[in-house]
Every structure is written in C-alpha cells, then in structure tokens.
C-alpha cells in the first residue's frame, strides 16, 4: 500500500533535484569543450528550453577528433557549428529502454535542425536510432548522414527538459545526392547523374525520395544507356525521383502508386515478410538520409512497368518503361539487333573452335603411354 506514495515521493525528489542542461554539462569534465562552444555560439538557451528532448552530447574526444579532421568548431563558420549541434538534438525523449524496445529495427526521428540551415526539408532533418547489436554497455546507436553509425558511450543522463547521451564522435550532417553516391560507392548512379546533367536538378529539390539502383543493376542496362542522349538519360534519372514526398520506409504500407519527377508512375508494395518492392525491384537498403530528403537502394533500375506480364531480362526491363523511354529504345532496334547478332556469332564461333580443339588435342606417340599435342 505504500508503493504509490514512494513513487510520488521519488518523482517529486527527481524534480526537486533536476538540473539544467548547462548545469549537467558543467559538472562533467568530458563535456567542458562542448559547454564552451554552446556558449560561444549562443545555443545554450535555445537547446535548454526545448521540452522533451534528447541531446547527443559530444565529448572532448569527439570535438578534438572533429578538429583533427579539419572542422574546428571554435573557428569554423558559426552556421556549421549551429547546424551540427542542432542536428544532435531530437524532438522527443529516447532512453536506452525506448531504443532497446525497437528490437534492432531502425527508427527515423526528427531533429532540431530546421530549414534552411544545411538541410532542405520542410519538417526539418532526420536521424535514425537503433539498438546496438554488438551488446555495448549502453545499447544505443545513432545513424546520421552517409549512413554513419555512432555508438553512445554513456546513456540516460537526465536534465530538466530531457535526456543526454554522450558520444565520442560527431553525427554527420546529411549530404546531397551526388556526395552521398560518391562517398557511398554508388559509382554507376553517380555516373548516370553526371552524364545526364541531372545533378543540379535533383539537388535543388526539397522533400524528395530517390530510388538508387545498385551498380550491378545499371551495369546490365549499360549497352542501352550508352546509346541514349543526355536528355534521354535525364528522363531515365527522373523516373527514380519522387518529388514532394519524403518517404521513409516506415511510411510504406500496402500498395501505393507514386508519381515521379517526369510524370510517370511507380508502384510500391509491401511483401509478406515486410520487404518493399518498387515496380519489380526490391529495396535492399532503406532510409539513406539526404540534404533534401531520403534515398533507398534498390536491386534493379526503374523503367516503370508497362505490362506486368513481361518476362524478366534486359528487353523486359526496357519494355516495362514509360512510352517515352520505349520509343527511344525502339528507335535503336536495328542497332540492338546487329549488336546481339554479332555477339551470337562470336559465341558460336568460339564454341566451335573449343570443340574442334578438344577432339584433336592429343594423340598417342608410342606404345609406352606417352602422348603429344597435335
């Protein structure tokens, strides 16, 4: 019967002894550089009075490592410093128990980084939280731009309006699509963006979802892509971008039709095991955070479906395209047939030569079991 009273007393004691964000940072030597920087850039009050927040506090080690990398927040552009610190604050409280309840599923969360400070999203920039699968002491990983994972080294430090988690490395601001592709090893898609002169167009968009084909998928279409002009390639790129929609994987539910940048449509559906399909391609990596939205990595290029009964393969992918792309490919049909015919002749000739050689490779030269090549 005394437990409720004890709980109330504990709650009151907690509130009576709660401290401000600045007071908590001041009591820990590992946050001395962070506290100085927050005062220098006038962020203490702004971060302090955001209710129900989670703040990923960079330790002295994190700030020194960032300076060694070339970004000294004491002397850097104040806007860069403000962006990094505001990106480290989430708009809700996420404790260790909250994150562990995700069961290794990543959760997209909103940060305090609002447009147009190093991001181009109407609702502000996002980060991702997941449970630490390595069984770390604190069990929290925060994912930021470029897919960088940062582990929490000390968790659940309370302050007046939320909770602090200490990190020994900085969170990375999400980059634009070209830098994300370049640094993420998405070489073929980056080449396609540059060849089609689509970089500026995509990077000017706010609230965009981009589906990035894996290198292997684009390599299969390379013979066709090589025959297209820059304008035609631009149309292909546009079919991989959905404007005015920031579609994190948690928002995909059931079947939905999306309109792409060039006005064609994509069909999104959830599989029985929770997998996500875009037309015939499967999403193999979700929620790559971008400066202007989000990207998903897929295992096939998106030439929107024209006939669901088409078989798989290069020409099926082409036939699945929009009428504009199909007309482009049809205009080159004689060239394609010639290339395929030459390839077939070459394969048959090599097979004939190989068979002939295998029949005449050796013959007996004496009666002692010795052989010689023909």
Swiss-Prot record:
It is a single-pass membrane protein. InterPro entries: Adhesion/Biosynth-related, FAS1_dom_sf, FAS1_domain. PROSITE patterns: FAS1. The chain crosses the membrane at residues 328-348. The keyword Cytoplasm does not apply. Its main location: membrane. Keywords: Glycoprotein, Membrane, Repeat, Signal, Transmembrane, Transmembrane helix. Glycans are attached at residues 52, 72, 120, 132, 176. The keyword Protein biosynthesis does not apply. GO terms for biological process: macroautophagy. Disruption phenotype: Abolishes the production of cercosporin. Pfam families: Fasciclin. GO terms for cellular component: fungal-type vacuole membrane. It comes from the Eukaryota. Coiled coil: none annotated. Belongs to the fasciclin-like AGP family. Fasciclin-like arabinogalactan protein; part of the gene cluster that mediates the biosynthesis of cercosporin, a light-activated, non-host-selective toxin. The perylenequinone chromophore of cercosporin absorbs light energy to attain an electronically-activated triplet state and produces active oxygen species such as the hydroxyl radical, superoxide, hydrogen peroxide or singlet oxygen upon reaction with oxygen molecules. These reactive oxygen species cause damage to various cellular components including lipids, proteins and nucleic acids. This is Fasciclin-like arabinogalactan protein CTB11. It comes from Cercospora beticola (Sugarbeet leaf spot fungus).
